[in-house]
């Protein structure tokens, strides 16, 4: 599987950063406008085994993305695994760790688009850079939203 990782430091307590990511509604708030990402069903509070459903992409080609919460270590780790969506396989971990007087968020995604060499080529040249850019944007938005909430 192809791996993408993005890590950033935040000037908030790890508990606040983790709580922010436990609210699935925040995903729409931090996602870039490309492609559109709309929550359809996001049980609150987030629990192990929950299924979260989103619509991804512009109308009329939007797809349903269904992910299950497959790991949950309160305050430290939230993992979602795609059950239905655009990827053959998708596992995304949100890891939160203390970092001095703040915290660190590390997003780790392991994915497979297609089970072929062409799929690996597309993943490496297209999907990987797009995901890295998306997580860079999400970390920036998270930082801004947490700063606004804090102040």
Pin down the residues of each PLM region.
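Beta-strand/loop substructures that line and gate deep hydrophobic ligand-binding cavities in soluble
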Residues: 81-132
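Hydrophobic pocket/interface hotspot
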Residues: 17-21, 27, 52, 69, ...
């Amino acid at each position: 599987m192809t791996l993408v990782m993005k890590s950033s430091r935040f000037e908030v307590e790890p508990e606040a950063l983790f709580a922010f990511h436990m609210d699935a509604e925040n995903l729409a708030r931090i996602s870039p406008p490309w492609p559109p990402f709309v929550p359809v069903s996001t049980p609150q509070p987030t629990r192990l085994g929950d299924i979260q459903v989103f619509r991804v992409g512009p109308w009329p080609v939007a797809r349903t993305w269904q992910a299950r919460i497959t790991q949950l270590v309160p305050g430290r780790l939230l993992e979602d695994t795609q059950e239905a969506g655009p990827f053959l396989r998708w596992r995304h971990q949100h890891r939160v760790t203390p970092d001095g007087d703040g915290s660190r968020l590390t997003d780790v995604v392991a994915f497979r688009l297609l089970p072929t060499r062409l799929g690996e080529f597309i993943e490496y040249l297209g999907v990987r850079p797009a995901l890295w850019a998306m997580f860079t944007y999400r970390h920036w938005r998270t930082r801004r939203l947490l700063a606004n909430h804090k102040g």
